From Swiss-Prot:
Family of this protein: Belongs to the aldehyde dehydrogenase family.
Domain of life: Bacteria
MF annotations from Gene Ontology: betaine-aldehyde dehydrogenase (NAD+) activity; metal ion binding
Pathway annotation: Amine and polyamine biosynthesis; betaine biosynthesis via choline pathway; betaine from betaine aldehyde: step 1/1
Pfam families per UniProt: Aldedh
Positions contributing to NAD(+) binding: K174, E177, G227, G228, I229, E230, T231, G232, E384
Gene that encodes it: gbsA
Organism: Bacillus subtilis (strain 168)
Protein name according to UniProt: Betaine aldehyde dehydrogenase
Amino acid sequence: MSQTLFIDGEWISAEKEQIRSIINPFNQEEIATVSEGGREDAIKAIAAARRAFDKGEWSSLSGLERGKIVLKIAELIRRDLEELAELESLDTGKTLEESKADMDDIANVFQYYAGLADKDGGEIISSPIPDSESKIIREPIGVCGQITPWNYPLLQASWKIAPALAAGNTIVMKPSEITPLTTIKVFKLMEEAGVPKGVANLVLGPGATVGDELAVNKDVDLISFTGGIETGKKIMRAASGNVKKIALELGGKNPNIVFKDADLEVAVDQALNAVFFHAGQVCSAGSRLLVEDAIHDQFLAELVKRAKRIKLGNGFHAETESGPLISAEHRAKVEKYVEIGIEEGAKLETGGKRPEDPELQNGFFYEPTIFSNCNSDMRIVQEEVFGPVLTVETFSSEEEVIELANDTIYGLAGAVWSKDIEKCERVAARLRMGTVWINDFHPYFAQAPWGGYKQSGFGRELGKIGLEEYTEVKHVYRNTKPAAVNWFNS
C-alpha cells in the first residue's frame, strides 16, 4: 500500500520513499503501511491544485454539475459503508457501531453540500446611485489546505472536503499521519465519482513538514485545521506571512451543567456518554461536570457506579462499549494529567489506572476516571485532557454556574440539564460557546454550524455557513448609463 499519495490525478509514492506503519491501537498489530510524504510532496500537490483551479475546469462547472459529483461521492460512501467502518475501527480502535454511524453521517454531509452547490445565485442589492445595478456574488476562494485530526479521521475530513468541492475550490488534504486509511479510501471514491485531475490532492505526512508547507505556501488561499490548540497557534503564525484565510477548530473543555430539577436518571446516563464516548477522545466531550450542590452526592454515587461497569474491549465485539486510546504517547499524556489531578487535591472516585484484564494488555486502554472535589484553579479543569477523565464541581446558583462554565480559555460546546426550560434558555444565552445543548449532549448534524468561541478557534464548519467559509464575496457594480465625470476640466 505504498502508493498512498494522490497528486494531480495519480496515486504515487513519496519522493523520498519513506514508509509509515499504521497500527491497531487495540493490539498494536500492523494493519497497513503507507507512503510518508514530506515538504517536497506538499509543494507538488499545491502546484497541482493551483493549476487545476486556475484552469477552471472545476470552478467553471455549474453548481448543479458539481453537486452531482459530490452527491455521487455520498452514494459511493454508502455503497462501501461496511468497508469504511471496518477500516476506521481498525485505525482508531473505536467500536464498529460508532464507525458505522460516522460513515452514515459522512455520507449525509456530502449529500447536504451537494444540495447546496447550486443554491447561491448571488444577491441583487438596491443601489443608492441612479442608473446603476449592484449585485453580491460568492466565488470559490481557490486552493484550500486541509488538516484533520486522528480522533474522527473521515468525519472531520468530510466537513472540509464536501463544502470546499461544492463551492468550486481545489484542495490539498493532510490527514493525521497515524489514522489515514479511510481518507485514502475516500479519495479513491472521489476519483471514481469523477472529480477532475488535480482538484483533490492527498499528501500523508507529519505536520512539521507537510502541514507547515500548507500554511506557509503562497499558492494556498485558505487553510482549515482541526486539532490541538498549540498546533493551531503554530499554523496561525506560519500563515500570517502571506495573510491567507484561516479556519481553526481547536478543541474544548466543555461544561455539562446539571440542575437539581433535571431528570437525574437521564442526566447521569448522558453525562457518561458525554465524557466516556470514544474514550473521551472527542473535542466536544463533556469533561467538566457541574452539578448543583443539593444533588451532588446522589448524582456522583450513581455516576461512579455506572462508570465502573463500562465495558472496555475490542471495537469489533458487540459487547464493547469503549475502545482504547489512540497511542502509547497519548495514554502517557492522560496518565500524567491524572497524576496532576491527584497532586492538585482532586479526589479520585474511580479509574485512574490501566485495566487489569489480560485481554487488554496489548492495547492502549485506560479506565474511565472520575475526579470529585475539583475547582477552576486546577489544571485538570482548565486543560483539555482528551481522554476518559471527568472532573466534578458543584454550584449553588445560576450566576455561579455561568461563571464556572465560562471560566476556561475554551468555548466550543456545553450542555444544560433542567426541567425548567426558561432557566435552560437563560443559562444557554450566557454561555460563551459555539454550541449549547439543552437536555441533551453531543448531537450535531450537517445543517447546523459547528465551531467555537475564544481559543476553541474561529470559523465554522457544517451548515450553510460552512460552505460560505470556502468562498470570497465580490461586489459587482454596473453603470447602466455611462457618462463622462468631467472632474478634471483640462
